[in-house]
Amino acid sequence: MGVFQVKCRWSHTAPDDPIVAPGLPGASHRHEFFGNVSTNAHSTTSSLSGRDTTCARPRDKAAYWAPTLYNDGRRVEPNLMIAYYRTGPLRNPSIIRPYPLGLRMIAGDGLATKPQPKLVTHWSCADNGPNGTSDLPRSCAGVPLRLKLVFPNCWDGKNRDSADHKSHMTYSYRHDKRCPRSHPVAVPTLKMGLRYDIRGPLNRIRLASGSRFGAHADFWNAWAPDAQRELIRKCLLRAKTCNSPALPPRR
């Protein structure tokens, strides 16, 4: 399986969501933003494309965000986000195409009232991925808490977004590892990995979207098209692992 990684520092926090509540600052639950430093309720593909990023690959101008996590009522700032762009569960990875500029996607369900599918949301302690669960672990003894969210990898080929922000995308794992006729364009499988420095009992965790079950994340593609295309060619289509460059020192 091919993959290329991008490490991104936390950028900012705000009660904004340019996908679900565009043009309405303060209308959303609080989110933590990574990547593009300008992301806000008024963001557009054009406004994102010309701005700086907190990511280690400077031509990744995409916006990434997830709901704020609270521990015993206190906001916890995630100390790192790693984006993993993978070939994903596809019978024929050679058909993968770049994301169209301006594509918006959501992974997970912010209104969930029970654990979500492990293939979409996945909690673990540090890097014990296979031992993680779709619900929060009881405790992380001496290691950080991690949340991974997996985005859909089949696009309808027409719409950069949809009314419910989900119908234009679907998961190949739901269709026998193929992209269905309704969503024929295979794109990279994006997995966002968030790390929180919470060590100890996790029974007082909640997300800004509601309960602990509502883990979700949003993505707005503003990659430089040629940079994304080259990483897909070099890493995904050749089944290679391309690790993230190191993050530059903090200013």
What are the language-model segments listed below?
Residues 1-28, 32-149, 156-251:
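Primary mode marks residue(s) on the alpha4-beta5-alpha5 output face of response regulator receiver
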